[in-house]
Each structure stands twice: as structure tokens, then as C-alpha cells.
């Protein structure tokens, strides 16, 4: 459910991208082909393992990949 809320928030021009990231409550790291990002448990604040990929496309890919690759660690 969080994935769909995040994607709809990103695609809605009246809401900011940061508000959609803040809906994530995930501890661990996420890897995909475009970028690396780490989440702590503080309402979606970025960790120190690469930061944000810099585009909405990367953020959507990270949301989708959370369910498949949650066991890998970067920190």
C-alpha cells in the first residue's frame, strides 16, 4: 500500500516528492540498477550510503524494489 501511495504522490503535481518519501517506514537498504539509497527508521530520512538518486524515476524504482531486495545491506 505504501508503494502505491508513494507513486501516486510523486505523480501528483500538487504534492512534493519529499512528502511521498516520508510515507516510507522501512529499515535497511535498497539497491537497484540506477542508484543506491539507505533508509533509517526516521520517516524516510536518507542515510549516508549514496543518498537520493536525484529523479522521480529512481524513487519509483526504489519503492518497487523494496519487496524484492530487502535482505541486502550497504552500511
UniProtKB/Swiss-Prot annotation:
InterPro entries: HssA/B-related. Pfam families: Coiled. It comes from the Eukaryota. Belongs to the UPF0512 family. This is UPF0512 protein C. It comes from Dictyostelium discoideum. The lineage of its organism: Eukaryota, Amoebozoa, Evosea, Eumycetozoa, Dictyostelia.
Amino acid at each position: 500500500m505504501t508503494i502505491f501511495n508513494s507513486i501516486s504522490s510523486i505523480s501528483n503535481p500538487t504534492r512534493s516528492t519529499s512528502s511521498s518519501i516520508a510515507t516510507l517506514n522501512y529499515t535497511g537498504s535498497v539497491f537497484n540498477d540506477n542508484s543506491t539509497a539507505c533508509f533509517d527508521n526516521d520517516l524516510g530520512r536518507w542515510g549516508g550510503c549514496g543518498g537520493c538518486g536525484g529523479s522521480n524515476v529512481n524513487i519509483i524504482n526504489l519503492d518497487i524494489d523494496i519487496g524484492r531486495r530487502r535482505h541486502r545491506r550497504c552500511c
